[in-house]
A protein has these predicted regions:
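An anionic, turn-rich surface loop/hairpin at beta-sheet edges
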Residues: 108-136
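Hydrophobic membrane-insertion alpha-helices, especially the h-region
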Residues: 12-27
Length: 170
């Protein structure tokens, strides 16, 4: 067997392996999400403002990525509860979820990793107003913080510690 044939066979194996590694790496890290934004502008679900009650609210602070805006929990006219983000902005990323965390605050990754949490689902957008429905069994006395959490990399993009409405007016 000559050297030319062995090199040719080697490249027939190496090139597909490189292509597969690039595709898997792109899928895992999703580098395009670092430079793209997903804007949302969801309307508030309440029809009758007089029947809407603020239960809790808090301001986002940055974690591993700049994060800003307000998180407010409302009880709306049908009795359901809604978590609403207003003036919200954070970085985009792969597999970013919204968590309700059983902690007073979540300033680092460990404070989310070592606490109980409820996953409200994938983030709807990294910029803009958005709503998340809260289950009727979610104990707001226990779950005191909203976290923007990247499941893929275990990173807390930012968090909003919540205060009861009675404390907000003081």
């Amino acid at each position: 067997m000559n050297t030319q044939d062995s090199r040719s066979k080697k490249w027939r194996v190496v090139i597909p392996v490189i292509i597969i590694a690039l595709v898997v790496g792109w899928y895992w890290f999703r580098p395009e999400r670092l430079v793209t934004n997903r804007r949302v502008d969801e309307a508030f679900p309440a029809i009758n403002d007089s029947a809407t009650q603020i239960l809790e609210s808090g301001t986002f602070h940055s974690g591993t990525h700049p994060t800003e805006g307000t998180a407010t929990i409302y009880r709306i006219e049908n009795g359901s509860r809604v978590l609403r983000f207003t003036n919200f902005k954070t970085s985009n990323g792969p597999d970013v979820h919204i968590y309700m965390v059983a902690a007073e605050d979540a300033r680092d990754n460990a404070s989310v990793e070592h606490a109980a949490f409820v996953d409200l689902g994938l983030i709807k957008g990294n910029i803009g107003d958005q709503n998340y429905t809260l289950g009727s069994d979610l104990d707001l006395a226990k779950y005191r913080t909203v976290s923007v959490w990247c499941k893929r990399f275990g990173k807390n993009f930012g968090a909003a510690p919540l205060m009861p409405a009675a404390q907000l007016t003081r």
